[in-house]
Amino acid sequence: LLVATGARERSLSFSGNTLPGVYGAGAFQTLVNRDLVKPCENLFIIGGGNVGLIAGYHAIQAGINVAGLVEAAPECGGYKVHKDKLARSGVPIYTSHTVLEARGTDKVESVVIAQVDRQFKPIPGTEKVIDCDTLLIAVGLEPVNEFLQIARTIGMDVYSAGDANEIAEASAAIFSGKIVGNEIAKKLGKDLPDIPASWMETEEILKSKPGMIVPETYIDKLEGVFPVFHCVQEIPCNPCSSVCPKDLIYIDEADIRHLPYFNEERADECIACGRCVAVCPGLAVSLVDFRKRSQTALVSLPVEQN
């Protein structure tokens, strides 16, 4: 038996959380991304993980104003590149804050937030009232694994994969399914080689939390053409290096959490194709081109349309 039932969203208890206009992130993203429905005009987000950060950016693309985002921890738990996209769009991000209540008569009309101390308790006198018509709750996921646990207690030969086994990014869930599928096939008698140790290492890399943030560095020259990387946090990501037709962008394939760098020794081979700019999911690559003017560069920036 393979259990790959995914995860469910965690709920959050606060006054007014049953008012119309309080959404889980999954329902909100389904409406916006799949059904192309604009469910609100003025959104406030609770939770600074990747789900909340990405949902906020999707809302902006759908023409929805994001009035703010609240995160109880001192820093957002999601990738910095996703947080930066919201910050560049002018979204206020309130770290070390929590939601106290949603206000409204027949629907959400505003939200009350407050700063928290180190024990995550609200600090009196720090309350803020923010107008909004919708609250998006994105405070984490938990595995849908009840059936898995029951199967184990009665002695069934059972496996789990993806978020039903461990909450992680989608890429990690897909890779864990590949590993477990291989294990099951061997158990059923298929003549397959042992799972390479590199697969297990890759799975751990894909499941890893955001790493350290390093100071942003720049190429100090006024000639030629070259990319500038604005990703300064170690996360498992390598699209920019994989699409470069000249192999001028390098990320250590043994551990794709390492930051990318441009091979300046071969900089004259760059053809300014812009693929690295277009492919970056964090919009964290720009292209600087001094070939026409030595003192004024043509800069290509990533923009995602509504």
Where are these regions (language model features)?
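Residues forming the flavin
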Residues: L1-N306
